From Swiss-Prot:
Keywords: Ribonucleoprotein, Ribosomal protein, RNA-binding, rRNA-binding. GO terms for cellular component: ribonucleoprotein complex; ribosome. One of its GO terms (biological process) is translation. The keyword RNA-binding applies. It comes from the Bacteria. Transmembrane segments: none annotated. One of the primary rRNA binding proteins, it binds directly to 16S rRNA central domain where it helps coordinate assembly of the platform of the 30S subunit. This is Small ribosomal subunit protein uS8.
Length: 132
């Protein structure tokens, strides 16, 4: 089945799995999804993820969700820039999420990174999603 927004699909799978208190969720693999998961893992929102390849050439990513005392670490995860409406921000206009308690993930010319990294490297880009 063709998905028009692969990153949005992955975020929705994570949101649904967190709502059902699942420990793992799987999604088709792509480079962008893996880079976003790298940021989520580095920031402590997921435990880990593993990528596996099937005989037919398709790959899948299995994500281990993180809970603290039974409460999901990810409270809210939303897509900002969508295929029909792209959202680009300069380094000066990168928004803070929940007064700095959450993060935004950006796709920049220097790679996919969290908002605080983009500010440090003085680079803007496409605002992919917000996590709190």
């Amino acid at each position: 089945m063709s998905v028009s927004d692969p990153l949005g699909d992955m975020l929705t799978r994570i949101r649904n799995a967190v709502g059902r208190k699942k420990t793992k969720v799987s999604t088709p693999a792509s480079k962008l999804r893996a880079r976003v998961l790298d940021v989520l893992q580095a920031e402590g929102y997921i435990r880990a993820y593993t990528q596996s390849e099937f005989e037919n050439g398709k790959a899948e990513i299995e994500i281990e969700l993180k809970y603290y005392e039974g409460v999901p670490v990810i409270r809210e995860i939303t897509r900002v820039s969508k295929p029909g409406r792209r959202v680009y921000v300069s380094v000066k206009s990168i928004p803070q999420v929940a007064n700095g308690l959450g993060i935004s993930i950006l796709s920049t010319p220097k790679g996919v990174m969290a908002d605080h990294e983009a500010r440090e490297q003085n680079v803007g880009g496409e605002l992919l999603c917000r996590i709190f």
